[in-house]
Amino acid sequence: MKYRKRGWPSCWWPRAAVLPMRRQGVGGAEKIVRIADISGFTGALGKTAEAIETTPAGVEKIVLVGVGEPGKLGNDDWLKIGGAAFSQIGNAERVTLTLALPETTIAGDEAADVALGMVLRSYKFDRYKTRKSEENGEPKHAAKITVCVADTHSARKAFEVAEAVADGVIQARNLVNEPANILGPVEFAEEAEKLEKLGVKVEVLGEKELKKLGMGALLGVAQGSVRPPRLVVMEWHGAKGKEKPIAFVGKGVVFDTGGISIKPAANMEDMKGDMGGAAAVTGLMRALAGRKAKVNAIGVIGLVENMPDGNAQRPGDIVTSMSGQTIEVINTDAEGRLVLADALHYTNDRFKPRFIINLATLTGAVMVALGQYHAGLFSNDDELADQLYDAGQSTGEKLWRLPLGTEYDKMIDSKFADMKNSAGRYGGSITAAQFLKRFVGETPWAHLDVAGTAMGSPANEYNQSWASGFGVRLLDRLVRDQFES
């Protein structure tokens, strides 16, 4: 993505960015007004209008992209503009996107967000298709895109950060989209190890080490699969001195059949995405390292497969977690919280972080409560919860806080152990969060239930993928706004 300086043209449509896609030549500003008038283009956010002209210099396609009311743009609107623009590129070889608005200066970070929206919209996961663009009518090549904006210096600088974040989102999407026969716990860990090239310290703990640590909850989930579990620890040291780290923990169930409490066959294929939390944490660590974030950050992901073989754990089993707390397994399909129990305690005990945020595709109940446009937010710390909420509003990866309380906590008490892993039908996402809360002590903590947003969420202008990469941009924004020194 290149940036080029562009002054204010003498004639312009006041609510549109312009995308001339051409072999040669540049259309005059007067064409823009004419296209808008003829097409009835209103400039509504994300709407487009286009015209194709044949000139002595070649063929030119001009596209107008609506930006809505400039003074009201916010959240992820600039990403939507970029995504809408990219959707119109087609087979153009060279593209120039001119960003300019009347009586308004487009800031460098806004221009970078437009470019980020284009990058995210360009993503597709088609590595297993043997016949690609020919049958889908997709471009056979990548267009060379130049973004014209008044302040090129700040735009380029902002895009260096945005590009690193895009790399993190794309990695998260790739991991979630990958089929489970290709991506098991070992293979996922190998992908995380590649972050060492960016300066991330990566440590992979195998089954022997996990047994030595006493991670009975995580190992109980893994024991039904022939694929061995892994716990991956990623460390990024970007702050000066010995500043306490911030920590992110992800659930990484690479495939979830439900175990002995097996799921229905319908839509079980989607459970290849039950590691969306671990994917987001891995993508976040890539983003932080890629942009050289000035913070010390820890990413921990627990990687298992939940299968129903003769050695699988049973309903009624009691396991001992690394914390020493015992858990009665009521439902083997409530396995993610068992993985997180040990991962959370390990992270808290080893690193003593300033806070812990965990991400997990944990419950279907959160989708019943919130649908697929908000992730569930639970926290024992109001300040952290508010910071996360604000980051969600800024990025468009929105959160909605749900309650915790002693009444819900009592629902997971067990007659035979310290707690049980399922409290039944009602308040399912809340009781799951209460379960996790028992493993973080007094450390500020937040749990993001991303079951409805990490995979299969509705497409938008900058995401047409089944896997969204939800959480990477959200948490990167949180780190930038609140915790970088």
Swiss-Prot record:
Mn(2+) 1 binds at D256, D333, E335. GO terms for molecular function: manganese ion binding; metalloaminopeptidase activity. Its cofactor is Mn(2+). Mn(2+) 2 binds at K251, D256, D274, E335. Pfam families: Peptidase_M17, Peptidase_M17_N. NCBIfam families: PRK00913.1-2 (NF002073), PRK00913.1-4 (NF002074), PRK00913.2-2 (NF002075), PRK00913.2-4 (NF002077), PRK00913.3-5 (NF002083). It is found in: Cytoplasm. This is Probable cytosol aminopeptidase. It comes from Brucella melitensis biotype 1 (strain ATCC 23456 / CCUG 17765 / NCTC 10094 / 16M). It is an enzyme of class 3 (hydrolase). Belongs to the peptidase M17 family. Binds 2 manganese ions per subunit. It comes from the Bacteria. Its EC number is 3.4.11.1, 3.4.11.10. The active site is at K263, R337. Presumably involved in the processing and regular turnover of intracellular proteins. Catalyzes the removal of unsubstituted N-terminal amino acids from various peptides. It catalyses: Release of an N-terminal amino acid, Xaa-|-Yaa-, in which Xaa is preferably Leu, but may be other amino acids including Pro although not Arg or Lys, and Yaa may be Pro. Amino acid amides and methyl esters are also readily hydrolyzed, but rates on arylamides are exceedingly low; Release of an N-terminal amino acid, preferentially leucine, but not glutamic or aspartic acids. Keywords: Aminopeptidase, Cytoplasm, Hydrolase, Manganese, Metal-binding, Protease. Its main location: cytoplasm. GO terms for cellular component: cytoplasm. GO terms for biological process: proteolysis. Coiled coil: none annotated. InterPro entries: Leucine_aapep/pepB (IPR011356), Macro_dom-like (IPR043472), Peptidase_M17_C (IPR000819), Peptidase_M17_leu_NH2_pept (IPR023042), Peptidase_M17_N (IPR008283).
